[in-house]
A protein has these predicted regions:
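Positively charged, aromatic-enriched patches within helix-turn-helix-type DNA-binding elements
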Residues: 143, 148-155, 159-212, 217-219
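A short linear beta-strand->loop->alpha-helix hinge motif most characteristic
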Residues: 211-236
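Short, Lys/Arg-enriched segments at the junction into DNA-binding effector domains
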Residues: 2, 117-171, 175, 226-229
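N-terminal/domain-start alpha-helical segments
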Residues: 1-122, 236
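Nucleotide second-messenger and two-component phosphorelay signaling modules
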Residues: 71, 123-127, 208-210
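Residue-level recognition of specific faces of alpha-helices
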Residues: 53, 65, 77, 83, ...
Length: 236
């Protein structure tokens, strides 16, 4: 999942971004509303952590523009991060399109829990554990299991599997995976996605269990619930 942190306090922005990256998310940072809108115009984000009080374009206006952008469907989830704690401020943020509202100062574990909760809404689940076939992913404890056996995954492999499991059965192009699992510093001209999918696929191969990730020729990859290729899908 790819996140955008919009915060004009540099130390706080970097601390939040570092914590989110340590949890396996791809994170970009914007220091003000104008930079945030520039990044939102070029990149697809799953969630935006958005400060309200910023010089120039404030967070409320950024949120309104996110919600008015009809070219993004779905538009990213928005988590407001602000020192404004009055009822009126919270209502204004939610009415302008925020999905959740967290008052500063906050404990990072709570921020992380709220991020997971918002992203679960798009995955259609109410718990921190994702399940596809005999594959289980505990996003809170960072534990991946298949057929009751623990899988040793790197942070990027875990993030990639999490994205697959929140989009089961969907064909995901390399461009889509690069956009949502890697940050803006990833080189789009490398074979990073193909290599990471390949290593993840090998780690998911437990015993005689069927392969869960198919290559759909000319289109991308798909996580199936039984490992059977569909249509023009062929394993690679």
């Amino acid at each position: 999942m790819r996140l955008l942190v919009v915060e004009d306090e540099t130390d706080l922005a970097e601390a939040v971004a570092r914590g989110l990256r340590n949890d396996g998310y791809a994170v970009d940072v914007a220091g003000d509303g104008e930079e945030a809108l520039d990044k939102l115009g070029f990149n697809d984000y799953d969630l935006v952590c958005l400060d309200i009080t910023m010089p120039g374009i404030d967070g409320l206006e950024v949120c309104r523009r996110i919600r008015s952008d009809t070219t993004r469907d779905p538009s990213p989830r928005v988590l407001m991060l602000t020192a404004r704690d009055s009822l009126e401020d919270r209502v204004a943020g939610l009415d302008d399109g925020a999905d959740d509202y967290l008052v500063k100062p906050f404990a990072f574990p709570e921020l992380l829990a709220r991020v997971r909760s918002l992203l679960r809404r798009d995955a259609g689940t109410t718990t921190a554990t994702l399940r596809v076939a005999d594959l289980e992913l505990d996003t809170a404890r960072h534990v991946a299991r298949r057929d009751d056996r623990d899988l040793e995954l790197t942070a990027k492999e875990f993030a990639l599997l999490r994205y697959f499991m929140t989009h089961p059965g969907q064909v995901l192009s390399q461009e889509t995976l690069l956009e949502h699992v890697w940050d803006e510093h990833a080189d789009p001209f490398t074979n990073t996605v193909r290599v990471t999918v390949g290593t993840l696929r090998r780690k998911l191969a437990v015993g005689d269990e069927p392969q869960l990730i198919d290559t759909v020729v000319g289109r991308g990859y798909r996580l199936t619930d039984d490992g059977d290729a569909l249509g023009d899908a062929t394993p690679s």
